[in-house]
């Protein structure tokens, strides 16, 4: 008999009512008495489990009644509609085959476990309700983002993981080397001889695919990358990880306003898609993780995002009378408390802050006519603060070279990036969305380690 997915049974119960079906999955819960028993079976296709009713008519009743949690079984039985019960239907088992026994020391027993404990068994945590919901939403949200860009004719670019340049100029990068670390070749000056390494120069894991995406935007017009990025930042916070995923679109013949419009459209599209395609998971988050999740998402979807310049924002914050922990001064980056105040108290909706001081932003952002600010924007959202950062890129070769020199960066590392301005360069813009931060926002999960399947953080590279 062909296997039927539990998702299909829930989505089309009337079609299967009274029919004999075969389902296979893992035992989430089992209760039994002398004459009958109940199994909660989850097959991974759906957030909810299906209830299997079995009794002494089964030849192996006693064996089934003693099965440990997480044992895998294959069940044949009749679909019985149960309109008055908790679940809309159950399966009356006619045959249960044991596919794989679980040892009795299976760590996910019936009691609730803390997220902190579940991180120590990251290979098993997707079997819990919270993480089943989280990682299905992660999958659905990723698909939504791809679909958004594909529907609009964007080209998906696979940018390199290993790079010879630092997009952010931050220097917090993971080195890539094949050198024998106990016998590193050195030059006459006592420094490491990079020419003897695999690539013949210093290379690192990428912190962003943006620079490479810009090259493709100047050929395909509209492109995006969606891939892993790495920061060797020794931050043990709930918002930082050493490995995370970034969504980075890049659009040619575009200015800052165009990229803000794109940002707003993409966020609303992805949120609507998740609400539509993961209703059970989102209801779970709203009930058990963060009771404001659905309200927050609907606020974003139904709002016109606000816009304010950094200079105006500083003035508003200074005149607010609010007691901030960190000072509010022109030239200093906004802290989370400032960002949240703007989005939650002043605008009460998402807001773009634009035109930041050049000294607190990256080298590639377009210098404004005032010579002090750049065409950059951060999207601030209620409940979290900054969610997305974007900018118009500097298309003027001389201005870009001056900026690289001003920051003490090595111009030679960016020869190809500068050359893009030499051969038909045009105005272009883009943004970066930390995918995990987006997931934290829509699920209410408070720690970035809980929205990445196998998190990589300082001192932690298990699994």
Curated annotation (Swiss-Prot):
Catalytic activity: tRNA(Asn) + L-asparagine + ATP = L-asparaginyl-tRNA(Asn) + AMP + diphosphate + H(+)
GO cellular component terms attached to this protein's record: cytoplasm
Record GO biological process: asparaginyl-tRNA aminoacylation
A GO MF label: ATP binding
PROSITE patterns in the cross-refs: AA_TRNA_LIGASE_II (PS50862)
Keywords, ordered alphabetically: Aminoacyl-tRNA synthetase, ATP-binding, Cytoplasm, Ligase, Nucleotide-binding, Protein biosynthesis
Domain of life: Bacteria
Subcellular location(s) per record: Cytoplasm
Primary residence: cytoplasm
InterPro entries: Aa-tRNA-synt_II (IPR004364), aa-tRNA-synth_II (IPR006195), aa-tRNA-synth_II/BPL/LPL (IPR045864), Asn-tRNA-ligase (IPR004522), Asp/Asn-tRNA-synth_IIb (IPR002312), NA-bd_OB-fold (IPR012340), NA-bd_OB_tRNA (IPR004365)
EC category: ligase
Similarity comment: family membership: Belongs to the class-II aminoacyl-tRNA synthetase family.
Subunit structure: Homodimer.
Name listed for the protein in its UniProt record: Asparagine--tRNA ligase
Species per Swiss-Prot/TrEMBL record: Bacillus cereus (strain ATCC 10987 / NRS 248)
